[in-house]
């Protein structure tokens, strides 16, 4: 029987330290050594999943292949280790309690008093162990900060792990902040010392300290942290601010993290194969070209709401030796009559080589998105629409090309005369919000000779989805008769999955979320095409 190894990553001092990037980077280093790696994100909130959470609260909702609506860190994991994860790889307090209470109602606890310890903690451990089956190493990131009340059951569960599977099979890594006090000109270790003290009071002694810092860590500071936090000096790892998140694995490898982890877990330390990763990072850091894509969205105040889109643009940019700048344009700014003047100014200032309209929900800012699409279509600016972005493209085309004045989606206007976008038939009897959309990977059949077919290079494609509305099949014919090509449909021919306008040099949209499948070594074709078209290339 294969011995499973578990690595638990906690965070201290403040949130948003980069635990997710640290975990993903370690996953990359271990996979580069030939190990089979799985990754888990624990979120100590009471929701079952992230699906009902506002982008302003939680950033984007990352959709897995099997339809899980999960934390955005799963996106980092997938991109860094180049593996598809599942909905089960995101554990929440809600999922754990739901499972325990369901078992209690079934009488599975045989009359025992159901308590946090042992029932909740056992459920957490069982979930992690089950996900670890078949893997050499499972990396588990504990969301939140040590000291948070809501994290305590998870911390207790991972404390017990070393007794359950043997301490030689468990590694604890603590990510903490070393703040730099400019007035004093020095890094301060006290917050990290107190964070480790808090962790040790729970019964967890970290094996490795990863210190987030904007300045180099001196030997003196390493020795001090090693002494007060009871770790080896070599286990104090510097994690300085990087030029790109994709440089972090290389920086941590230079610090000796990969070698240290394999040593502490009694695993063979093989030479990591990071050549392709280094080439990718070099292209990101040293581009030869530059373009600016305008992202017209509703949630642009919080860039994490579109995280996978920005990463997909980085991947496509690197493939084309191009730095992709993003011009964040709030869609509500384009709802005035002067929207064309604003977009004209962006073009004159070289701030609008291409336009991307991402997904979203609700009618706020929708007319601004429609105006941006009209501008892209009429001025032949490379355009990519995603999910709601495709629906808005259909509305714009129906109004301004087909002559269907007032055409709309029933999401925005239930009484529209021309419902060119309508609720999916299977959604019409559903009232619950959580986990009820059309979620996960679905196939589409592409029409040969179209732009979509040229970009993908094959007839059948699978993309991830997250939507309730579709292009109304009753309007397919009139749209196509006026020059809109429905270049990809569901296998039954009912649902429009891709649309394009062939007379424009690059005008394409999809009902799916292609950004979730883009990887550093495999940029998504739609984003690659957008960057190439924005550079002036004709897509052949």
Curated annotation (Swiss-Prot):
- Explain what switches its activity on or off, per the activity regulation comment: Allosterically activated by GTP, when glutamine is the substrate; GTP has no effect on the reaction when ammonia is the substrate. The allosteric effector GTP functions by stabilizing the protein conformation that binds the tetrahedral intermediate(s) formed during glutamine hydrolysis. Inhibited by the product CTP, via allosteric rather than competitive inhibition.
Catalytic positions are: 387, 513, 515
Positions binding Mg(2+) in this chain are: 73, 141
Sequence positions that bind ATP: 16-21, 73, 240-242
One Gene Ontology MF term = ATP binding
Q: Which residues bind CTP?
A: 15, 148-150, 188-193, 224
List, alphabetically, the SUPFAM superfamilies matched: Class I glutamine amidotransferase-like (SSF52317), P-loop containing nucleoside triphosphate hydrolases (SSF52540)
Q: Which PROSITE patterns match?
A: GATASE_TYPE_1
* EC number of this enzyme: 6.3.4.2
Which reaction(s) are listed as its catalytic activity? UTP + L-glutamine + ATP + H2O = CTP + L-glutamate + ADP + phosphate + 2 H(+); L-glutamine + H2O = L-glutamate + NH4(+); UTP + NH4(+) + ATP = CTP + ADP + phosphate + 2 H(+)
Per the record, its GO cellular-component terms are:
cytosol
Q: Where is this region: Amidoligase domain?
A: 1-267
- Which EC class heads this enzyme's classification? ligase
Chain ranges of the Glutamine amidotransferase type-1 domain: 292-540
The entry marks the following residues as binding L-glutamine, namely 56, 360, 388-391, 411, 468
Q: How does it assemble?
A: Homotetramer.
Q: What is known about what this protein does?
A: Catalyzes the ATP-dependent amination of UTP to CTP with either L-glutamine or ammonia as the source of nitrogen. Regulates intracellular CTP levels through interactions with the four ribonucleotide triphosphates.
Q: Give the protein family.
A: Belongs to the CTP synthase family.
Q: Additional info? A: CTPSs have evolved a hybrid strategy for distinguishing between UTP and CTP. The overlapping regions of the product feedback inhibitory and substrate sites recognize a common feature in both compounds, the triphosphate moiety. To differentiate isosteric substrate and product pyrimidine rings, an additional pocket far from the expected kinase/ligase catalytic site, specifically recognizes the cytosine and ribose portions of the product inhibitor.
| Protein name (record) | CTP synthase
What gene name is listed for this protein? pyrG
């Amino acid at each position: 029987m294969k011995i499973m190894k578990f690595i638990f990553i906690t965070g201290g001092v403040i949130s948003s330290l980069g635990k997710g990037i640290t975990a993903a980077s370690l996953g990359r280093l271990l996979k580069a050594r030939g190990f089979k790696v799985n990754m888990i994100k624990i979120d100590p909130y009471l929701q079952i999943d992230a699906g009902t959470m506002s982008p302003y609260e939680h950033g984007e909702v990352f959709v897995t292949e099997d339809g899980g609506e999960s934390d955005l860190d799963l996106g980092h994991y997938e991109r860094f280790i180049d593996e598809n994860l599942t909905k089960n790889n995101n554990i929440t307090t809600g999922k754990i309690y739901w499972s325990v209470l369901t078992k209690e109602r079934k009488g599975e606890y045989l009359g025992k008093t159901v308590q946090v310890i042992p029932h909740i903690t056992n459920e957490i451990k069982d979930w992690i162990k089950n996900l670890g089956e078949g893997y050499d190493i499972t990396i588990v990131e504990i969301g939140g900060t040590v000291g948070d009340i809501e994290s305590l059951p998870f911390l207790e569960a991972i404390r017990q792990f070393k007794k359950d599977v043997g301490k030689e099979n468990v590694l604890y890594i603590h990510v903490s902040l070393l703040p730099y006090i400019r007035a004093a000109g020095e890094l301060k270790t006290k917050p990290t010392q107190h964070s480790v003290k808090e962790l040790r009071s729970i019964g967890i002694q970290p094996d490795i300290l990863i210190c987030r810092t904007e300045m180099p860590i001196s030997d003196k500071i390493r020795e001090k942290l090693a002494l007060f936090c009871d770790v080896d000096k070599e286990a104090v790892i510097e994690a300085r601010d990087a030029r790109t998140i994709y440089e972090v694995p290389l920086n941590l490898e230079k610090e000796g993290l990969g070698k240290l982890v394999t040593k502490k877990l009694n695993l063979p330390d093989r030479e990591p194969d990071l050549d392709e990763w280094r080439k990718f990072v070099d292209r990101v850091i040293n581009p030869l070209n530059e373009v600016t894509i305008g992202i017209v969205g509703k949630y642009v105040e919080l860039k994490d709401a579109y995280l996978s889109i920005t990463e997909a643009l980085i991947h496509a940019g690197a493939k084309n030796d191009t730095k992709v700048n993003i011009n964040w344009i709030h869609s509500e700014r384009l709802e005035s009559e002067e929207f064309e003047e604003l977009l004209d100014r962006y073009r004159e200032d070289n701030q609008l080589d291409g336009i991307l309209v991402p997904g979203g929900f609700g009618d706020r800012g929708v007319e601004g998105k429609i105006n941006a699409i009209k501008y892209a279509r009429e001025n032949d600016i490379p355009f990519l629409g995603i999910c709601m972005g495709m629906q808005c493209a259909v509305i714009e085309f129906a109004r301004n090309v087909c002559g269907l004045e007032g055409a709309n989606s029933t999401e925005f206007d239930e009484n529209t005369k021309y419902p060119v976008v309508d609720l999916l038939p299977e959604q019409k009897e559903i009232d619950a919000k959580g986990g009820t959309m059309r979620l996960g990977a679905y196939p589409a059949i592409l029409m040969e000779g179209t732009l979509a077919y040229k970009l993908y290079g094959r007839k059948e494609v699978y993309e991830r989805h997250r939507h309730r509305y579709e292009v109304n099949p009753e309007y397919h014919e009139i749209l196509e008769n006026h020059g809109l090509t429905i270049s990809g449909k569901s296998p039954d021919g009912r649902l429009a999955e891709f649309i394009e306008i062939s007379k424009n040099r690059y005008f394409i949209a999809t009902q799916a979320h292609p950004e979730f499948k883009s990887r550093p070594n495999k940029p998504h074709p739609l984003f690659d095409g957008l960057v190439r078209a924005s550079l002036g290339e004709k897509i052949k």
